[in-house]
Amino acid sequence: MPAHLSKSVGRRLSRTGFARLALLPLAIVATAFFLLPMIKLVIVGASGEMGLGAYAAILFEPRYRASLISTVVLAAVTTIAALAAATIAGLFLQRHRFPGRAVLIAMLTFPLAFPGVVVGFMIILLAGRQGLIGDLTSRLLGEKIVFAYSIQGLFLGYLYFSIPRVILTIMAAVEKLDPALEEAARTLGAGPWAVHRDVIFPALGPAFVASGAIVFATAMGAFGTAFTLATNIDVLPMVIYTEFTLSANIAMAAALSVGLGVVAWASLAFARSLSGGTVAAAG
């Protein structure tokens, strides 16, 4: 082998070895904190009286099936609402400069710093029995409207912590749009709505898919907010908690956890296949 080819191959092997070495800590962490616990969870889920039937019970047992469906529907509605609200806000904030803009962005993204229990408590202060909405409606309508502990209150809590995740993604995507494409569309006679429909929204498609998948997966597994608000709502995280603590049915809790993880992972994998890019995990 010629000397220059030998050196080139050596450098390539050296880079490959360094890359593998650099990935070793990540592989260790992923194995220790994800792969092994997930394998253990699958085994525990099949170790109860029902055996592997515990996984089938998620779909065929009425209570578990209803919980799964309601959780998926709630997560889907939250995703759609968050995309709609955050897209409008993200487009406006990225394309306009005005006094107080930085403060407004900070306020809109501030919920990322809150744990789910705090979000739930804020919904109680807003729409609980002694909340702001209840006081206003009592004075204006003579009847106190309370919905903090209903599916509407849970939806509001999920929406509150979901919007920031979409806004940040949309703003970053809008910043990368090519203004020349919009100018070309306007030159050809396209109106504002046509420009958004034919140019802007298609260009933002990967951002919609990525942020939507993150919101959906996060809403599927949100526990803190559900624990605070869902006293009479059987969303899947609460059913898992109930099976584990009150019923001491550890096998069923493990099986439900695996089912929840599969649905969340499938949404992220599907989004990745659609967008052709990376879908980051939400914190």
Question: Which positions does each model-derived feature cover?
Answer:
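Glycine/proline-centered hinge or cleavage motifs at structural transition points of membrane proteins
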Residues: 188-190, 202
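Glycine-rich helix-loop "coupling/hinge" segments at transmembrane-helix boundaries
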Residues: 47-48, 125, 223-248
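Short glycine/proline-centered loop/turn elements that form peptide/ligand docking sites
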Residues: 177-181, 279
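Membrane-water interface segments at the C-terminal ends of transmembrane alpha-helices
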Residues: 14-48, 60-175, 199, 203-223, ...
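Short coil/turn motifs that cap or connect alpha-helices
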Residues: 99, 190-192
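Short, charged juxtamembrane terminal tails flanking transmembrane helices
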Residues: 3, 273-283
